[in-house]
């Protein structure tokens, strides 16, 4: 393609959206400079962290060095953590210096809200990194029995900013693992959520099916009560307190801390406001994909890797149109694809604006 001078692209992040952005640029003939900013040149495959407690995956299986990827696609890696943005001067601020850009793709991911009392001290956040999966594995191995509570919440100011699917996988996966080990009878499993219908994004039929499966597996539920506190051995809610020797909780999400100094338009939930083309309104050279963005769409719009990929692809195609001076009319497809894995079987959930499909089978299990 015919690149103009204003085509130095900078990408923030090293996750799904960021890597899809790189691939989409090169696939569509972009041959100019690409710089990717991230703390480490590593892609972490968080979706498979559900298999760490069972030993099916280890850290080295899920942390993929990006050196060859960068070399193959001619990407300059810049080591740093973003601290702010100077959009007037087209500069990204990091703890390792500033990086200038002509076009910017933000794919830095979000962060979990950790404001509830006791959440930092007494809770494992399953998708907060590989270390969380390892901590769960190690603590579970040391337990002779007890109560394990697993749940998720949301961002009250940003309904779409939640990630509940992996918690269902941990619930069913732990049940299966403990049965395999012959010690399920020594443990009580509790699924909890402040939402009366947790997992509603997956569709009403999916929620009913997931809760029915819990009952079948003798997994207790504690639903519809606002959480007040996590203690060392219990969870306190407005509906009462229940014991927990090991607590896994996925809180709602918000944007990264540096957004407060970015000058970008933020939603009530703390994420960058974006349009259906993954562009930031009012900023002609800034695009966004994934968990750090607040996108238009149905209430079930997912915060998941697949959606980040779709947003990155649309955003980059619009970026390339802007560079070429042609109409930028690309919009990301809205769809949810989730395979709820339970170690020995799985449930496929698919949803788009026209349909919702649920399929229970073994075909997707490795």
Region roles according to the model:
Residues 1-7, 74-182, 248:
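FAD-binding core/adjacent interface of flavoenzyme oxidoreductases
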Residues 2-75, 158-200:
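Beta1-alpha1 glycine-rich phosphate/pyrophosphate-binding loop at the start
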Residues 29, 314-366:
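C-terminal, flexible cofactor-proximal segment of oxidoreductases
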Residues 31-35, 72-88, 92, 99, ...:
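A Rossmann-like FAD-binding core segment of flavoenzymes
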Residues 34-36, 104, 148, 189, ...:
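Hydrophobic/aromatic residues located in beta-strands of well-ordered beta-sheets
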Residues 43-46, 113-116, 257-258, 295-296:
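Short acidic/His/Gly/Ser-rich catalytic and metal-binding motifs that mark active-site loops
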Residues 120-145, 234, 241-246, 250-310:
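FAD-site-proximal beta/loop scaffold in flavoenzymes
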Residues 145-148, 154-216, 220-222, 303-318, ...:
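Rossmann-like dinucleotide-binding core of oxidoreductases
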